[in-house]
Amino acid sequence: MPSRTESRPVRVLLIEDEPTDLARVNRVLDQAASSFTVRAVPEVRAAATELGARSYDLVLLGLARAEIGDGDGFEAIRRLGKTAPVIVLSRLDDEDIAVKAVQRGAQDYLVKDRLTVDLLVRSIRYARERHRLLAEQNRRLEHELKIAAFVQQSFLPGRVPEVPGHDIGAHLHSSGQVGGDFYDFIDLPPDRVAIAVGDASGKGIPGAILMAETQGVLRAEAASCATPIELVRTLNRALLHDQDQDRFVTLFYGVLAFPTGRFTFVNAGHPRALLLDGATESTLVSTGPPLRLFADAAWEEKTVTLHAGARLVIYSDGVTEAQDDTERFFDLEGVRAVMTESPDRPAVELARDLCHAAEEFERGSPDPGDDKTVVVIRSR
């Protein structure tokens, strides 16, 4: 907030269509020792246009009872708060409404009939400072997420292996938050390939670091481990080197033998994979806990056969836990719908289509969602 000696007045955009309330707010600001310039508009649409054309230090949003009742007022707070700090002015002295307004992004909620010079000036000062600190925090977070995204992308395999008798495709969509999703393929000569899909807990740099550490150990140890369960045990021991037990990794790790189509896997706390084989459907559920939680953890190794025409889809929880604006989950039904709509499409297209379908599903949700990773194996 500017001091009394600041070189320019505080630019205030007032959204108010009640003449009496408009006069009251102007009168209060005129009495303040600080200098303000106020431009008033009668509605949110006009305010959005004004904010696009000029720079303002603060928005005072007068909300009527009807706007609060139908939710339009709260939506206005969310939109306007992206541009400038918002203080809500209302005739309603309602604590629940005040809390909702702040949750949607308002810096303060003031009752019009109780408005005083000191109260409004203090609220403006604090609102501007909180908005400034939040903007700085968001800039730091954005920088961190760019680093995390770079780490995540740099650890993805450069190519998808060409496997006789099988078509393999993969796709990873990073959310704005960037989690610890990853996938990997490791050649195991002469006739096997290892396939991994994992999710390291945490967002930003912490999740990216744990993801990178997990993939590093996986790549270093896969060739020397005779079975998937041996690899998972080795990986768990390697990741348990510190005391940060709040962090963990879910992992679906399997080895595909080309000639037979036998797929041996361990599911360490990861979402169940979906196997569609002709008219038969089965899920490859968790066979043990996530990695990095327990030194004495136990897992079970299982084997399935991928017959000609079978499709196996392995995905991260960002796919099935995608939510629409009614908080309904994409879930396994969404995965099944995409995989059965065009079953003969190339694996890479199926993987990409599934990620995109989950993204579209949650488009209207206020939650940005999680990373989405999909690996598809089609047997010919």
Whereabouts are the PLM-identified features?
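Receiver (REC) domain switch/output surface
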Residues: 119-131, 217
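Conserved acidic segment of CheY-like receiver
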Residues: 7-21, 25-29, 40-41, 47, ...
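… and, occasionally, acidic/histidine-rich disordered N-termini of signaling adaptors
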Residues: 135-313, 366-380
